[in-house]
Curated annotation (Swiss-Prot):
Residue numbers carrying N6-acetyllysine: 26, 57
Keywords, alphabetical: Acetylation, Hydrolase, Phosphoprotein, Protein phosphatase
UniProt-annotated stretches for the region Disordered: 1-133, 218-239
Domain FCP1 homology: 282-441
Modification Phosphoserine occurs at: 28, 51, 85, 104, 134, 165
Gene Ontology cellular-component annotations: nucleoplasm; nucleus
EC number: 3.1.3.-
Organismal lineage: Eukaryota, Metazoa, Chordata, Craniata, Vertebrata
Domain of life: Eukaryota
Single GO BP term: positive regulation of protein export from nucleus
Protein name: CTD small phosphatase-like protein 2
C-alpha cells in the first residue's frame, strides 16, 4: 500500500510542477490588473467595458492628489496667508516682520500693526505706505509740556475743585495747534474756554504791560479771539466796533486774577494729602524755593529750534518725540547761587516723562535741584493744574514759589513771585533781578509772605467782590 502511494507521488510530481507554474503565471496577470482603489480583481477585458474601467481607474487617484486630506507641516508653513493679520501686496519680505502692540485710538483694544507698513517721520508723524493694507496709525501729542490754563467764566466759576471741564477734552488738540502755529517770536499759546472757543493765554497775561496803545491790543484781539456775537463777513472781517465795546468785558472775564478770585476751595481730601517730599535733614537749607520749569527756566518745543541749547528724545504714548530746549539767560548762575541758601524744588505741571529727563540732563547729580514734583502732584480744578504748596510738607512761612503763571499758585498767592514768561529773548535778565530780593528774605529770617505781598501786591490785582 505504501509502495503504491510512493509511486503515485513520484509520477504526479511533474504534473504538479506544471500546475504550480501555471498558477503563478495566472496570479501574476491578475495582480497586474488589480485597481489601486481596492476593487475586486477581474480578468483581462477588451473593448468598450475595458476602456471605461481604465478611464475610471486613471481619474480617481488624480482627484485624490488634487485634494489631499492632509498636508505636511512644511507645506503649511509655505503659505503665509494663513498667519498674516492683514492682506499684503507686492513681494513678500525675506525676513520676519517685526510687530508692536498698542492701544487702538477708538476703543482702547490692543491691536497689532506692522511697522514695515509705515514710514516714521520726525516727532512721531507717520506716513502711510501706499502698498500696505494695514490701517493707518494715528498719534496724539497729548500734553507733555505744561498745559495752558482754562479761565473761569460766570457760567462755570462755581465749579468744584478737582472736576474736569469740557475744555480739557480738547486740551491736546489745542497744544498741537500751538506747536503747528508757532511763530518766530514764539509767544502765542492758545487756551480753550468752557464752550470750546480758543483764546490767547499769552496775550491776556502780557496785555497789562503793553504800552503800544489800544490799537495794538485790538489787533491782538481780532487776530486771536473769534467774535462771540458779531457776524463775520469775508469783506469786513471782525467788527472793530465790537472789539472796542467788548474789550474791557473780555479782559475782566479772562483775567488770570479773575480765575484766582473765583477758584473753589480745596476739598477735605486734597487738604489731607500726604506730603510728597521727604523730611528735611540737617544739611537742608531752612528756606524752600519752588521753581516752575516751562517759560520760567526754559522754553521747549517740538519744532526744530536753530538756537536750541540741547535736544533729546522723549517716548510718549508709544511715539518718540524730539524736544528742543532753550535755556533762559542766567539760568545756571541763578540756580547755583540760590541752591546755596535755599532748598530748590522744581514743581512743574508737565509730564514726568519729559521734565524728569530734562532735569537729568541739566542737573544729573542733583546738586542744584533737590526735589522734583510733576503734574500728578498738582490739583486739577476744572481742567487747570494748580500747585498747592501744602503737598510739600514744608513751613509755608519759609516757602517761596516763582512761576510765570500766577494761576499756578492760586491757593497761596502770598507765597508767589510772578515772573515774565520767557521764550527766546537773549537779553532777558529777570532771573538776575530776583536774586537780591531772595537773598534779603533769607537774611531777614522772617515770614516771607508779608514781604512778598508788599513787594508784588498781587492781591491788589484781584477783581472786587
Amino acid at each position: 500500500m505504501k509502495l503504491r502511494t510512493r509511486k503515485a507521488s513520484q509520477q504526479s510530481s511533474p504534473i504538479q510542477t506544471q500546475r504550480t507554474a501555471r498558477a503563478k503565471r495566472k496570479y501574476s496577470e491578475v495582480d497586474d490588473s488589480l485597481p489601486s482603489g481596492g476593487e475586486k480583481p477581474s480578468k483581462n477585458e477588451t473593448g468598450l467595458l475595458s476602456s471605461i474601467k481604465k478611464f475610471i481607474k486613471g481619474s480617481t487617484p488624480k482627484e485624490e492628489r488634487e485634494n489631499p486630506s492632509k498636508r505636511s507641516r512644511i507645506e503649511r508653513d509655505i503659505d503665509n496667508n494663513l498667519i498674516t493679520s492683514t492682506p499684503r501686496t507686492g513681494e513678500k519680505p525675506d525676513k520676519q516682520l517685526s510687530r508692536v502692540r498698542r492701544k487702538s485710538p477708538v476703543n482702547g483694544e490692543a491691536g497689532s500693526y506692522e511697522m514695515t507698513n509705515q514710514h516714521i517721520k520726525q516727532n512721531g508723524k507717520l506716513e502711510d505706505n501706499p502698498c500696505s493694507g494695514s490701517p493707518p496709525r494715528t498719534t496724539l501729542l497729548g500734553t507733555i509740556f505744561s498745559p495752558v490754563f482754562n479761565f473761569f467764566s460766570p457760567a462755570n466759576k462755581n465749579g468744584t475743585s478737582g472736576s474736569d471741564s469740557p475744555g480739557q477734552a480738547v486740551e491736546a488738540e489745542e497744544i498741537v495747534k500751538q506747536l503747528d502755529m508757532e511763530q518766530v517770536d514764539e509767544i502765542t499759546t492758545s487756551t480753550t474756554s468752557a464752550n470750546g472757543a480758543a483764546y490767547s493765554n499769552q496775550a491776556v497775561q502780557v496785555r497789562p504791560s503793553l504800552n503800544n496803545g489800544l490799537e495794538e491790543a485790538e489787533e491782538t484781539v481780532t487776530r486771536d479771539i473769534p467774535p462771540l456775537t458779531a457776524p463775520v463777513t469775508p469783506e469786513s472781517g471782525y467788527s472793530s466796533a465790537h472789539a472796542e465795546a467788548t474789550y474791557e468785558e473780555d479782559w475782566e472775564v479772562f483775567d488770570p486774577y479773575y480765575f484766582i478770585k473765583h477758584v473753589p476751595p480745596l476739598t477735605e481730601e486734597q487738604l489731607n494729602r500726604k506730603p510728597a517730599l521727604p523730611l528735611k535733614t540737617r544739611s537742608t537749607p531752612e528756606f524752600s524755593l519752588v521753581l516752575d520749569l516751562d517759560e520760567t527756566l526754559v522754553h521747549c518745543s517740538l519744532n526744530e529750534l536753530e538756537d536750541a541749547a540741547l535736544t533729546f528724545p522723549v517716548l510718549f504714548q508709544d511715539v518718540i518725540y524730539q524736544v528742543y530746549v532753550r535755556l533762559r539767560p542766567f539760568f545756571r548762575e541763578f540756580l547755583e547761587r540760590m541752591s546755596q541758601m535755599y532748598e530748590i524744588i522744581l514743581f512743574t505741571a508737565s509730564k514726568k516723562v519729559y521734565a524728569d529727563k530734562l532735569l537729568n540732563i541739566l542737573d544729573p547729580k542733583k546738586q542744584l535741584v533737590r526735589h522734583r514734583l510733576f503734574r500728578e502732584h498738582c490739583v486739577c480744578v476744572q481742567g487747570n493744574y494748580i500747585k498747592d504748596l501744602n503737598i510739600l510738607g514744608r513751613d509755608l512761612s519759609k516757602t517761596i514759589i516763582i512761576d510765570n503763571s500766577p494761576q499756578a499758585f492760586a491757593y497761596q498767592l502770598s507765597n508767589g513771585i510772578p515772573i515774565e514768561s520767557w521764550f527766546m529773548d537773549k537779553n532777558d535778565n529777570e532771573l538776575l533781578k530776583l536774586i537780591p530780593f531772595l537773598e534779603k528774605l533769607v537774611e531777614l529770617n522772617e515770614d516771607v509772605r508779608p514781604h512778598i505781598r508788599d513787594r508784588f501786591r498781587l492781591h491788589d490785582l484781584l477783581p472786587p467782590d
